[in-house]
A protein has these predicted regions:
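Conserved cytochrome P450 K-helix/beta-meander segment immediately N-terminal to the heme-binding cysteine loop
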Residues: 66, 78-80, 96-123
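Cytochrome P450 catalytic-core helices
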Residues: 8-26, 31-33, 142-159
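A structure-centric feature marking long, well-folded core domains of fungal metabolic enzymes
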Residues: 23-26, 69, 104, 135, ...
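Conserved cytochrome P450 K-helix E-x-x-R motif and the immediately C-terminal K′/meander segment
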Residues: 43-84, 105
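An acidic site on a long C-lobe helix of protein kinase domains
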Residues: 51-54, 128, 145
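Hydrophobic, well-ordered secondary-structure elements that form the walls
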Residues: 30, 62, 88-91, 114, ...
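Cytochrome P450 proximal C-terminal region
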Residues: 35-37, 41, 134-203
């Protein structure tokens, strides 16, 4: 479980950075939020993460577009039932395709577009997000994963200005596997923010 959590957390952080590099106005907005809520005299802490609404929206939108586990864990039907008009006998193994649900144009406006704002202020669209599953059988590590990604991504945004390594748009091709890694490694350029340099020098 620890290994699975580590891989999915790092994968989500990498996808988030790739998306932010292709949309440079988004990390600027997140930087402004962090500066206002946390300041520049200390690093972001785990207690800060839940208070940073736009950072949370970036993470949610990343998980919508690139869920670390695009197919949720298999479940078995405990009784005969109907799902979407289909007969499902008792004992059937069921998989939920979170990737397809998160990109369904019937459920999401402009589903292929990276738009963290869709999760702001409790908008209805946000209730359809399920990267960790739903109900009593959803991933028990959800809270830890969200807190960890928030802390890592928040610190990267707070402390550095980021740019694309070669100046061209980051390739968003998806790799294969159980977890949805990137097809090509992410390369980026970073520069310490002047406002955070004194904090970084003390680390």
């Amino acid at each position: 479980m620890v290994g699975a959590g580590t891989e999915t957390t790092s994968t989500t952080t990498e996808w988030a950075m790739a998306l932010l590099l292709n949309h440079p106005e988004k990390p600027k907005k997140a930087q402004a939020e962090i500066d206002a809520a946390v300041g520049t005299s200390s690093l972001i802490t785990p207690d800060d993460v839940p208070r940073l609404g736009y950072l949370q929206s970036i993470i949610n939108e990343t998980l919508r577009l690139y869920p670390a586990a695009p197919l949720l864990l298999p479940h078995q039907s405990s009784a005969d039932c109907k799902v979407g008009g289909y007969d499902v006998p008792r004992g059937t193994i069921l998989l939920v395709n979170a990737y397809a649900i998160h990109r369904d144009p019937a459920a999401w406006e402009d589903p292929a577009e990276f738009r963290p704002e869709r999760f702001e202020d409790g908008k209805a669209e946000g209730r359809l997000l399920m990267p960790f599953g739903m109900g009593r059988r959803k991933c028990p590590g959800e809270a830890l994963a969200l807190r960890t990604v928030g802390l890592v991504l928040g610190a990267l945004i707070q402390c550095f200005d980021w740019g694309r390594a070669d100046g061209v748009e980051v390739d968003m091709a998806e790799g294969g596997g159980v977890t949805m890694a990137r097809a090509v490694p992410l390369e980026a350029m970073c520069r310490p923010r002047a406002a955070m340099r004194h904090v970084l020098e003390e680390l």
